């Protein structure tokens, strides 16, 4: 039995010096496997007298159990250490600083539209909306632009077929409002419009805000005062404003509105092409034909209308020189307007 005690001591020492689970497995096979040292000792029982076999067999089983117990304990220690290391690697260190969440903000075009709407609703205008897919009648015919009219060449239109198109302005909303509502009418019509044009100052899709007022005894002075006050409030400064005679099929008389350049205060710069003036919108008195086709008597009621591009006003207010920047979805650009 001295040989048995020596094998157990060797096994326990080997287990103690094992460096990992793979080493423990090799030790198990060496001592407890089918051809292991302790297994071979068990096979020698047949060489012993019958009366000694039970006692020796019991001693061998105790030795095997002892080695197995130490192996399992050592293996459990390795597994626990491995699990602890894995959990430590995967845990979240709550003492580290957080990544932080940047707050979002409204898009500059949305800000501009809200600013325009806020002014006009404050002075009694309502907000009107209409379809972006429009018919030819409301986009052109009802606005005094018949099929043969040369003004149609001013609109690079996206047509679906001969009668349906993407609206080129929000004026059809004014027509639909006049068809369904009797004067007095005071509305602004913000929305997306579409024209086949793309460069640093034009986009195939852009936002337009048009306004309409129809009532008795309305004249150009009312229009002029409304626009001058709007520009003063929108740009938050006193600006010189001028009205240049122009032509639109749906207004008569018509005018282009220029204001003092916000970049150079009228001194002349690259933005205003050294003129000191910037064009900001078109306007005019509603043409009698437009009122008549909408079911309103032009002898009793008069009206004025105006239209402006939201992108154009945003470019001037924020000093942006390329309209396409508004639609590039570049967070570095948009973050400036939070």
UniProtKB/Swiss-Prot annotation:
Indicate which residues the UniProt annotation says bind Mg(2+). Answer: 252
Picking any one GO biological process from the record gives:
phenylalanyl-tRNA aminoacylation
Q: Which cofactor does it need?
A: Mg(2+)
Q: Where in the cell is it found?
A: Cytoplasm
Pfam families recorded: Phe_tRNA-synt_N (PF02912), tRNA-synt_2d (PF01409)
- Name the EC number(s): 6.1.1.20
Keywords assigned by UniProt?
Answer: Aminoacyl-tRNA synthetase, ATP-binding, Cytoplasm, Ligase, Magnesium, Metal-binding, Nucleotide-binding, Protein biosynthesis
Listed GO molecular functions? ATP binding; magnesium ion binding; phenylalanine-tRNA ligase activity; tRNA binding
State whether keyword Magnesium applies: yes
Q: What's a single GO CC term here?
A: cytoplasm
Per the entry, the cofactor note is: Binds 2 magnesium ions per tetramer.
Would you indicate the residue range of the signal peptide? Answer: none
Coiled coil as a keyword? Answer: no
Catalyzed chemical reaction(s): tRNA(Phe) + L-phenylalanine + ATP = L-phenylalanyl-tRNA(Phe) + AMP + diphosphate + H(+)
SS bond partners: none
The record's section on InterPro entries has: aa-tRNA-synth_II, aa-tRNA-synth_II/BPL/LPL, Phe-tRNA-synth_IIc_asu, Phe-tRNA_ligase_II_N, Phe_tRNA_ligase_alpha1_bac, Phenylalanyl-tRNA_Synthase, tRNA-bd_arm
Which HAMAP family would you find in this protein's record? Phe_tRNA_synth_alpha1 (MF_00281)
Q: How does it assemble?
A: Tetramer of two alpha and two beta subunits.
Which protein family is it in? Belongs to the class-II aminoacyl-tRNA synthetase family. Phe-tRNA synthetase alpha subunit type 1 subfamily.
Name the record gives this protein: Phenylalanine--tRNA ligase alpha subunit
Q: Which organism is it from?
A: Pseudomonas fluorescens (strain ATCC BAA-477 / NRRL B-23932 / Pf-5)
């Amino acid at each position: 039995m001295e040989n048995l005690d020596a094998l157990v001591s060797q096994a326990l020492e080997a287990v103690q010096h094992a460096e990992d689970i793979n080493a423990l497995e090799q030790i198990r096979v060496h001592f407890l496997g089918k051809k292991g040292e302790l297994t071979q000792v068990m096979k020698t029982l047949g060489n012993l007298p019958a009366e000694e076999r039970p006692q020796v067999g019991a001693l061998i089983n105790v030795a095997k159990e002892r080695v197995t117990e130490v192996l399992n304990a050592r293996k459990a220690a390795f597994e626990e250490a491995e699990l602890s290391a894995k959990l430590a690697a995967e845990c979240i260190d709550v003492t580290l600083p957080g990544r932080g969440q940047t707050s979002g903000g409204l898009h500059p075009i949305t800000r501009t539209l809200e600013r325009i709407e806020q002014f006009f609703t404050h002075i009694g205008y309502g907000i009107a909306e209409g379809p972006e897919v429009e018919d030819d009648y409301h986009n052109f015919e009802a606005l005094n632009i018949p099929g043969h009219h040369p003004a149609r060449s001013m609109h690079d239109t996206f047509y679906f077929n001969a009668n349906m198109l993407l609206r080129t302005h929000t004026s059809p909303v004014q027509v639909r409002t006049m068809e369904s509502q009797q004067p007095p009418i005071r509305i602004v019509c913000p929305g997306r419009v579409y024209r086949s044009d793309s460069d640093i100052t034009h986009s195939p899709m852009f936002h337009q805000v048009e306004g309409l007022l129809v009532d008795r005894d309305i004249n150009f002075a009312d229009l002029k005062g409304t626009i001058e006050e709007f520009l003063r409030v929108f740009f938050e400064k006193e600006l010189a404003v001028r009205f240049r005679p122009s032509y639109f099929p749906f207004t008569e008389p018509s005018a282009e509105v220029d204001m003092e350049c916000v970049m150079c205060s009228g001194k002349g710069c690259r933005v205003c092409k050294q003129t000191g003036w910037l064009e900001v919108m078109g306007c005019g008195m509603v043409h009698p034909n437009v009122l008549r086709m909408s079911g309103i008597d032009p002898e009793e009621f008069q009206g004025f209308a105006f239209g402006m591009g939201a992108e154009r006003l945003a470019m001037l207010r924020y000093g942006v020189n390329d309209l396409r920047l508004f639609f590039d979805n570049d967070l570095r650009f948009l973050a400036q307007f939070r």
